[in-house]
Amino acid sequence: MARGLDLAPLLLLLLAMATRFCTAQSNCTCPTNKMTVCDTNGPGGVCQCRAMGSQVLVDCSTLTSKCLLLKARMSARKSGRSLVMPSEHAILDNDGLYDPECDDKGRFKARQCNQTSVCWCVNSVGVRRTDKGDQSLRCDEVVRTHHILIELRHRPTDRAFNHSDLDSELRRLFQERYKLHPSFLSAVHYEEPTIQIELRQNASQKGLRDVDIADAAYYFERDIKGESLFMGRRGLDVQVRGEPLHVERTLIYYLDEKPPQFSMKRLTAGVIAVIAVVSVAVVAGVVVLVVTKRRKSGKYKKVELKELGEMRSEPSL
């Protein structure tokens, strides 16, 4: 009996350790990025999380870089895991989703090939800024995107939002949810139903711990589309003076520190179609004008000949 009492403290200690271990395991998640695999294998049992697809250790106290997030999304598609599976229309730009190459800091490399023989150069946001070429294409640097314009169109409301209230709410959102320094949100414009949010950040302005405007814009875009990257959150719930802000369309424009290098091949099918329609219309107009003039000229000649014939047939006095 005494021996059983001696073992009781040891059993309680083992039970406490097991409970602590299970609790640590259950709390080992990344609140700012659910596309991670977390464990307590860090030094001293510390929770550490690695991005899916790249296995890069991420800092869960801030936003994960856009390059690592795109890498994780492509990994989720390939593995069939239903984490953040966007619709086929939920693309970042006209080129759609691709499997990016990231450097050791999680930033986009200057040249991207999507694991194919076709390559192109991208900016710091990962958006193509040159024509596509082969693997001999050289991209000397990653040109920084210093200005991002987010354009939103909200659903019809009983009355327009107050501009000042809307401005304050969006600034609070970017500061509290995306940890973006207030100085990097330069302006909020509003003309019902269009809202424009301007983010500006030069390389010299960004500190070591500052969130990049590219990452903040990407997290915001996923939130707006109901595909939140935050752990345990379902989309975005923004209210202005108690009135919910429901967004039905999002467009994001990127301005780089250097102009893009596109050739005339960059013309889209839509632009080419417009040019073709205008050209056909001009040619048709010219043809109609020429035919009309010829018809009028022919009538005049017939009248002149008829009058001349009548004059000849009249008897002389």
Swiss-Prot record:
Record's bilayer topology term: Single-pass type I membrane protein
Cytoplasmic side: 292-317
Regions of this protein lying in the Extracellular compartment: 25-270
Main location: membrane
UniProt tissue specificity: Expressed in kidney, lung, ovary and testis. High levels of expression in immortalized keratinocytes.
InterPro entries: EPCAM-Trop-2_C, EPCAM/Trop-2, EpCAM_N, Thyroglobulin_1, Thyroglobulin_1_sf
Subcellular location(s) per record: Membrane
PANTHER family for the chain: TUMOR-ASSOCIATED CALCIUM SIGNAL TRANSDUCER (PTHR14168), TUMOR-ASSOCIATED CALCIUM SIGNAL TRANSDUCER 2 (PTHR14168:SF5)
Family to which this protein belongs: Belongs to the EPCAM family.
Protein name in the entry: Tumor-associated calcium signal transducer 2
Natural source organism: Mus musculus (Mouse)
